[in-house]
């Protein structure tokens, strides 16, 4: 007679085949998200260089003509134009944001399926894209008038006299437009990664 506290378990013979468990889990689908996160990080590094390069180039744009009169000295500097001051400040802010967004981009590489960092980055990328586009467009308009003048308003082109100044400001505008294009790519890639979730 068996007591009520014991359980009878039949002994297995060594000849009975045992089922085998899978030790390695199947890879999660969506490994391409890690690739997008790596490209995102590299593009952010490029955008940092473009934005801070644009701000630095514009901030150092200064030229004084070698001739002057008794009362006037002819000088062109970025701080003579409020649009260029706005440009320097906003592109510096954009560059700082991009530097501060690099850790979140690294988190997206480590955890490619995490939604929080991607959503946060896409929202802030859109805000700073707007800021970068506004400053690049306004500076481009002033650079265009500096190169070509405006006959209707009797504004003369100043780039004939201030060639170095115009070259620096034009380079800064081109660099800022590169940053804008990179922002657009970042937003599209983030949207694709979020849309496939």
Swiss-Prot record:
Task: Report the transmembrane regions from the record.
Answer: 35-55, 86-106, 119-139, 172-192
Q: Does the keyword Thylakoid apply?
A: no
Coiled-coil features, chain-numbered ranges: none
Q: Name one GO biological process term.
A: cell wall organization
As for membrane topology, the entry says: Multi-pass membrane protein
Q: Which UniProt keywords apply?
A: Cell membrane, Cell wall biogenesis/degradation, Membrane, Transmembrane, Transmembrane helix
Predominantly, its location class is membrane
What InterPro entries does the database record attribute to this sequence? CASP/CASPL, CASP_dom, CASPL
Q: Does the keyword Signal apply?
A: no
Instruction: Specify the domain of life of the species encoding this protein.
Output: Eukaryota
GO CC terms of this entry: plasma membrane
- Cytoplasmic topology ranges: 1-34, 107-118, 193-197
**Membrane side Extracellular: which residues?**
56-85, 140-171
Write out the annotated subcellular location. Cell membrane
In which family does this protein belong, per the annotation? Belongs to the Casparian strip membrane proteins (CASP) family.
Described purpose of this protein according to its UniProt entry: Regulates membrane-cell wall junctions and localized cell wall deposition. Required for establishment of the Casparian strip membrane domain (CSD) and the subsequent formation of Casparian strips, a cell wall modification of the root endodermis that determines an apoplastic barrier between the intraorganismal apoplasm and the extraorganismal apoplasm and prevents lateral diffusion.
Oligomer and partners = Homodimer and heterodimers.
What NCBIfam families does the record tag this protein with? A_tha_TIGR01569
What is the protein's given name? Casparian strip membrane protein 4
**Protein's organism:** Lotus japonicus
